[in-house]
């Protein structure tokens, strides 16, 4: 019975901690520029490209971003894709993100990202893991990031200028 109570306590605390997290979203758009492409065969290729554009979060913050991407494709599917992003907020403060995508089609997919090396006050986002979805139309890209952050950090981000 004692162990059951301990387990119940741990699970209730875990649930409470999850409930105290808030959704932080970033919508980003940009243009793709292919730097280098290697066609290994008709169905296998490598691309190195950049994406530059703008973003806005669900708190009204906004800015510009630049992304460097390396990707390998086989039969129009992503085999491996890695990227690094620099986000510059309206207050000229910078935070970086890196992400990966291991599967999906060339035109769309989902992956994981982590935010890091943020300048104050963006440093409250350091080590925040996010899920992202991306889709392409010609040379245009649309992304949505979904992150969970604490109420305290959400309030800090509401007040950046």
Please describe what each predicted stretch is.
Residues 18-161:
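Beta-strand-enriched cores of mature, soluble protein domains
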């Amino acid at each position: 019975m004692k162990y059951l109570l301990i387990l119940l306590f741990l699970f209730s605390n875990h649930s409470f901690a999850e409930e105290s997290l808030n959704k932080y979203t970033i919508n980003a758009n940009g243009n793709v520029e292919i730097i280098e492409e290697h066609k290994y065969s008709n169905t296998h290729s490598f691309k190195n490209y950049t994406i530059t554009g703008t973003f806005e979060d669900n708190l009204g913050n906004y800015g510009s971003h630049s992304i460097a991407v390396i990707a390998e494709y086989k039969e129009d599917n992503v085999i491996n894709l890695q990227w690094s992003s620099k986000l510059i907020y309206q207050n000229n403060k910078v935070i970086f993100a890196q992400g990966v995508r291991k599967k999906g089609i060339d035109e769309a997919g989902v992956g994981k990202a982590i935010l890091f090396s943020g300048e104050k006050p963006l440093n409250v986002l350091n080590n925040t893991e996010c899920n992202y979805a991306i889709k392409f139309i010609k040379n245009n890209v649309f992304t949505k990031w979904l992150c969970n952050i604490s109420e305290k950090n959400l309030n800090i981000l509401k007040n950046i200028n």
